[in-house]
Amino acid sequence: MAEEIVLYYFDARGKAELIRLIFAYLGIQYTDKRFGENGDAFIEFKNFKKEKETPFNQVPILEMDNIIFAQSQAIVRYLSKKYKISGNSELNEFYADMIFCGVQDIHYKFNNTNLFKQNETTFLNEELPKWSGYFENILKKNNCNYFVGDDLTYADLAVFNLYDDIETKYPNSLKNFPLLKAHNEFISNLPNIKNYISNRKESVY
């Protein structure tokens, strides 16, 4: 019997999108419950908190066979380990996590710029090129389509999600980073990812 999986988040990409990409890549069926899709998001979220456990009073929340999982980064790591896309050795698991942590750093800076209009010039002229250079160098060193080892890990999906997000606001951000651009094109054309993106609804963030 297949386990029942429900992902709870707002009607947006945000902190849930990497989780959705992991499920898409793996071909795992789940219910994508979005607050605000058919009504008031905050009223729906308030009612949800009355019904379900929310350890930190926030989403995303993942429910698998009546177990509640909270915190987006912890969920990503758990799923990656469970479904064997976390790296095929202890060292590769470390490298994947290292890259994932780097993605969180620059994604945080992008969100401050995109959502809160903070330091846009600094982000575009300094932070984005700097971090893109870091990722470009890692790809160059690994010398293949993947960031870690010779197979896909959640680090690849995390970097793809980062630039998929950034390029909705700042197109051509990867024009000076050929390996990173090729990587994103490679991930976007994986059959399950391509199908997910082509059917993904538009969202404000």
Curated annotation (Swiss-Prot):
EC number, as in UniProt: 2.5.1.18
CDD domains, alphabetized: GST_C_Sigma_like, GST_N_Sigma_like
Keywords: Transferase
Residues in GST C-terminal domain copies: 89-205
Domain GST N-terminal: 3-87
Reaction equation(s) it catalyzes: RX + glutathione = an S-substituted glutathione + a halide anion + H(+)
Listed SUPFAM superfamilies: GST C-terminal domain-like, Thioredoxin-like
Function: Conjugation of reduced glutathione to a wide number of exogenous and endogenous hydrophobic electrophiles. May also function as a storage protein or ligandin for parasitotoxic ferriprotoporphyrin IX (hemin).
Quaternary context: Homodimer. In the absence of ligands two homodimers may interact to form a tetramer.
Family named by the database record: Belongs to the GST superfamily.
Protein name: Glutathione S-transferase
Naturally occurring in which organism (per UniProt): Plasmodium vivax
Gene that encodes the chain: GST
